[in-house]
Amino acid sequence: MAERANLVFHNKVIDGTAIKRLISRLIDHFGMAYTSHILDQVKTLGFQQATATSISLGIDDLLTIPSKGWLVQDAEQQSLILEKHHHYGNVHAVEKLRQSIEIWYATSEYLRQEMNPNFRMTDPLNPVHMMSFSGARGNASQVHQLVGMRGLMSDPQGQMIDLPIQSNLREGLSLTEYIISCYGARKGVVDTAVRTSDAGYLTRRLVEVVQHIVVRRTDCGTIRGISVSPRNKNRMMSERIFIQTLIGRVLADDIYIGSRCVAFRNQDLGIGLVNRLITFGTQSISIRTPFTCRSTSWICRLCYGRSPTHGDLVELGEAVGIIAGQSIGEPGTQLTLRTFHTGGVFTGGTAEHVRAPYNGKIKFNEDLVHPTRTRHGHPAFLCYIDLSVIIESEDIIHSVTIPPKSFLLVQNDQYVESEQVIAEIREGTHTFHFKERVRKYIYSDSEGEMHWSTDVSHAPEFTYSNVHLLPKTSHLWILSGGSCGSSLILFSIHKDQDQMNIPFLSVERKSISSLSVNNDQVSQNFLSSDFADKKKSGIPHYSELNGNLGTSHYNFIYSAIFHENSDLLAKRRRNRFLIPFQSIQEQEKEFIPHSGISIEIPINGIFRRNSIFAFFDDPRYRRKSSGILKYGTLKADSIIQKEDMIEYRGVQKFKTKYEMKVDRFFFIPEEVHILPESSAIMVQNYSIIGVDTRITLNLRSRVGGLIRVERKKKRIELKIFSGDIHFPDKTDKISRHSGILIPPGRGKTNSKESKKLKNWIYVQRITPTKKKFFVLVRPVATYEIADSINLATLFPQDLFQEKDNIQLRVFNYILYGNGKPTRGISDTSIQLVRTCLVLNWDQENKNSSVEEVRAFFVEVSTKGLIRDFIRIGLVKSHMSYIRKRNNTPDSGLISADNMNPVYSISPKVGIFQQSLRQNHGTIRMFLNRNKESQSLLILSASNCFRIGPFNHVKYHNVINQSIKKNPLITIKNSPGPLGTSIQISNFFSFLPLLTYNLISVIKYLQLDNLKYIFQVINSYLIDENGRIFNLDPYNNVVLNPFKLNWYFLHKNYHHNYCEETSTIISLGQFFCENVCIAKNEPHLKSGQVLIVQRDSVVIRSAKPYLATPGAKVHGHYREILYEGDTLVTFIYEKSRSGDITQGLPKVEQVLEVRAIDSISLNLEKRIKGWNKCITRILGIPWGFLIGAELTIVQSRISLVNKIQKVYRSQGVQIHNRHIEIIVRQITSKVLVSEEGMSNVFLPGELIGLLRAERTGRALEEAICYRAVLLGITRASLNTQSFISEASFQETSRVLAKAALRGRIDWLKGLKENVVLGGVIPAGTGFNKGLVHCSRQYTNILLEKKKKNLSLFEGDMRDILFYHREFCDSSISKSDFSRI
């Protein structure tokens, strides 16, 4: 050793890492004994210094970091800006939550990093600083909570609480912060109590599965190895992990650099050799691992490698299995206590940022990136490959390479300042975070009407569902307004866009309950002559409008019940008529029979020509039983058009309707039962039964008669025909006919008797066999049909004597065809005839086909009595003037189906032009998709606000443009980012489109003849998609009203720069909050333009919600939503708290081979298909051999990596060898399959992989098997020792099975010998145990051979014992002779 005078004094702090390195180098240079002597001296010195220093901890030693104040203030400011962005609709709730978490997490981490330099500069001998950073007591996380800030906390489930604790424990917590802190404290206490036992049980199972693994040979002779490379296909392995993987291993192959061998096979790898190999840049190194060892129940020295205790090859007889189990289980036991100390503080991760080194201009290739949104909602560019970004300043050009899948946060040619963030890198972070997919539901803050842009899929995700998917980022708008049901709007004749008084709207109800009347007041007649003849004075009784709607997917069906002796008092005018109802709001729970009139109104309130307006099911034409329908005459079948069909509201659907031209029809009843195919029928075909006869076990007949059984697909149809059976003579004429109706008066002539019939009968010929037949005479029910009702008497004479052009016609429909069977399902009745009112009108102009009939519900109050009416009015449609959105101006006219409805059209708009007063509201009509009720939306003055009057509007017949010169606005920035709202930061002019005429408001600015007249001189016209139209300045131009924004370019524009721009306010346009639409007048609220007047705009309040692709929108377009209704569902990944208590269950899941995620069916099919293919290509033995081998190798590597990931995330280092020994045991069994049947093993039997291979080689017969993962519990219960299994779990079952099978335990493991009190075959008892076992094998083998056993059992035993004997003898000869 060098002289003391020549020693160099190092003035450095030695922490735990430095001491580890020191000890390692001391052992390398001086050996174990001398190192322990030196370390004893260090220990003594440490105790002396600690005693002299006498460190104590006081409250004054907790020094708060001075920069904390402004750091927290800065985080609060960022949170406030984030809240505003969310309010404006720029970010959605999930992005806001993510950004909020990262803001506070970054603040907390920065404070933690500041803590050490602060202590080092201000008070380096501070006891808190010395303790926490020496590693002796406490850690940085605990001290950070004492002097920094506690930050974000986890709840007991590991979920993050998004309210941060800004105080530290030195300053003291507020009440809210204290309650949140209690979550963490409780979590720590619970984890310490509960999870410690879990970790202990895991250790026990791990030790159980590998207790018999002992090093028993030096070399197993394997030629296999596992290749380790620092560069993987997917990611780079860090150098530290690479070195840890290699140190202590043994090489499987020689390593050559060029032609020179630098390391040879079976050489163990030390730190020096590993560093040399890394320096040489070796691509891949093949090493031996426990996976490659050829032994079944033990391991060799070279496959295990160096012993972790003394750094040399492991000794023979060492129980490496127990060491492996303890090494994996022990950190789990220790780490559960860590939660208690840190108190459940959330630990997450932030992205790495690339910052600009100095001021300059950014340059990059725009073709290699595409625009996207970051997870915080910021606009960014995503690059798929390595992107070179150049920063140019005056004298320096600096290049930065951005890795793939990173976000670029700056634009090309943008000027950046020094330290500005230019990119965000999310790849390459190796910290492991537990993530889970979470659903986040966004609820509506206010009541109103839902609108969205064209970016939302209007077709629902599934049929009849209300979930819509988003293909791209879009805004959802909730337009404000209070809703009321139709029966609750008081004292108003409410039509769309009418105005009404608001004080009466005090009642709001979310759903309208069904109203009803008493059953005994229901009339059985529909439109009888009583309606026309009686002229009563006073107020007649009317039926009520029922809120129950039909289940039809197309129409509303309102059941309206007319009372007895009541007039159908209807007002009639040219082009319209009113039908009254009476609202009776008592007896809400009465059942409404279907005998009333049902008025059917289409979902859009529009009737087409010849559409059915109402229908009535007469109870006289209703049957409870099944049967066959026959017409009196057969010439009548005129089928009504498909669009006039009515879908029945009951259980069954009707066939096509037939218009009756006959005076009677006949119904032949029969009893029908449809039974499952497997039913046990207790009657025979063509037998005769009486009433109440048992047909099946739980079914009895209602009538008596002839049984007919027909077997059809998957069902049995059993019919009972009632009637008389006759066996006719040859002279009977009736016997030649079958299926005919005989009227009364015509009797059956017979030699013995003759009588006349009183009723119609139906004659049917029955032929049970070819030679025998008889005639069944069945009774018939006859129905007469009354004449059609004349509707001229329905309406009283009109004083004005106007020509009627709306007609109502009455049609009777038979709902079943001639000879068609009717089937009643369970107890439902069958309606045979339906009476319908059909609406029609005369066309005034033969060339015009735009007339249509609209239905409105009207409620009128007269002297305190409230009456409901349906108002049917003929109006002209304005739809044909509306063009489709995004069409070019010359695309022609389209139909109303393609319009994007903003507001319903009303023919009278005079009232709507008035300004909104405080006590007035505007009515909006709605028809809900759920068909519960018709709803109305009331817009009051509180829902709208006015902008204006504007002073800068000039009236000319040419469009006046207020021009703001700004050459830096590019065209692509002018339209809104979502296509629905414009970006108005640089628009300072408000420009309504005006001509000489006054403007009436329908859906847009309506000029004369419903056309838009523009005179654009020397200008181009640009639509919002950026297309340029060069317009003829001398022609009138018809523009699309659904183009939300038109921009005017002067002719001398250049480089796509917009020199002159103007704002056009369109009706129905959406504006976000805080943008300018007029000069110096910011827009204070978000909303939709409702009224455009000469100098001002009325805007309806609206709340925007942002939704990104993958979100699900609940509800339909223009549906009324209530406060608290679910609006959007986001599905996103969320980090969980990354402590060991979340990690241990994952380790257990992997080791017990439980399914973590459900595998899709497609993947399973593909795997099965691959197995079949490889078997077919390679043949049965090779296919199974290679398939099982590949599966086992890949699954082993994957399992090791998964377990290591959990422990490394906690900073725990476990050598791969320990995990490999465990994983080898749970993957070492294979399942014998049924494909190639062998004489050795049974299908479904679990055998060792090596045993299956050796048996196959010995027998020269293919054994078909497939790989199986057992799990540590199942592997412990599938060993060669039943004593070991019984001492682990299920003792009685294991011992009973072992006794029945006659199993023999060879006491090869440690546990069996411990249980029986023998010497364990490890360590010093290694030799004795093995020799003893060998002798035992031989004796038993000889005894067995002496006995006469069956041939099969003898063969089995011979093979197995030969193998064992050979192995043991070779061990004892080769290895033990040297010891």
UniProtKB/Swiss-Prot annotation:
It holds the Pfam family RNA_pol_Rpb1_5. InterPro entries: DNA-dir_RpoC2_beta_pp, RNA_pol_beta''_euk, RNA_pol_Rpb1_3_sf, RNA_pol_Rpb1_4, RNA_pol_Rpb1_5, Rpb1_funnel_sf. The keyword Zinc applies. One of its GO terms (molecular function) is DNA-directed RNA polymerase activity. GO terms for biological process: DNA-templated transcription. It comes from Barbarea verna (Land cress). Its cofactor is Zn(2+). SUPFAM superfamilies: beta and beta-prime subunits of DNA dependent RNA-polymerase. Zn(2+) binds at C220, C293, C300, C303. CDD domains: RNAP_beta'_C. DNA-dependent RNA polymerase catalyzes the transcription of DNA into RNA using the four ribonucleoside triphosphates as substrates. The gene is rpoC2. It catalyses: RNA(n) + a ribonucleoside 5'-triphosphate = RNA(n+1) + diphosphate. This is DNA-directed RNA polymerase subunit beta''.
